[in-house]
A protein has these predicted regions:
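Alpha-helical scaffold domains
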Residues: 1-218
Length: 218
């Protein structure tokens, strides 16, 4: 039994197939599920993820991509968790841009943005120029990644970059961009509420972005 088959056996045991239709419906019918709730998935996959610690960067990336190719969505969540565990150890060339654009939806994109790409860039600040490129990309999922990659950096956040990305994308009518702008600003407001208030007051944000940004500080 190879490693992916071993994980599949564990997830299948943890699955409640009766949950799968509702999980699929929540994702607008786009993806198949085994029916494993998030807590059960983490419990089932956690030991498997830990058992891959010795695989090294090449091994982790090979596994991450193999997981992404599995048809059920839960495997992509495990892929995100595996990469997030080792984000600080991955090489700069591992920036998982291709995974962002494969079977994209908010559930995988946000995990990649905040925990994988964010973790990778946090340890290798030279990669922020790549985020600058993504912030102006034609694909809105990649722009969402750029906006959200500093989501949990707190005082390490490059506020100038955050505000610049938000301004550059503020006029985009795409819901997932407007929501990302508000979310990123709201999270940074826990660190510097006055800076966020000042930016929101001067920027031409959509009502959705503005409302989300100020939700916790008004």
């Amino acid at each position: 039994m190879d490693r992916i088959d071993a994980l599949r056996a564990q997830l299948t045991t943890a699955a409640d197939p009766a949950r799968a239709p509702a999980m699929r419906a929540y994702m607008r019918g786009q993806f198949d599920f085994l029916g494993v709730a998030a807590p059960a998935r983490r419990k089932a996959a956690g030991p498997w993820i830990q058992s891959q610690d010795a695989a090294g960067a090449d091994g982790w990336l090979e596994l991450a991509n193999a997981l992404w190719r599995q048809p059920e969505r839960e495997f992509k969540y495990v892929s995100v968790d595996l990469q997030a565990r080792h984000a600080a150890e991955l090489p700069a060339a591992a920036l998982p841009r291709l995974l962002v654009t494969a079977k994209s939806w908010w559930d995988t994109v946000d995990g990649l943005a905040a925990w994988v790409i964010g973790g990778l860039v946090r340890g290798r600040r030279e990669l922020q120029t790549e985020m600058d490129t993504l912030a102006g990309d034609g694909g809105f999922w990649l722009r969402r990644v750029a906006i959200l990659h500093q989501l949990y950096w707190k005082r390490e956040t490059d506020a100038g970059r955050l505000f610049r990305y938000c301004s550059a994308n503020a006029a985009d009518p795409e819901f997932f961009i407007r929501k990302a702008i508000g979310w990123a600003l709201r999270e940074y407001a826990y660190t510097d509420a006055e800076a966020v208030r000042g930016f929101v007051a001067s920027a031409a944000l959509s009502p959705l972005s503005r409302r989300e940004a100020l939700k916790r500080i008004q």
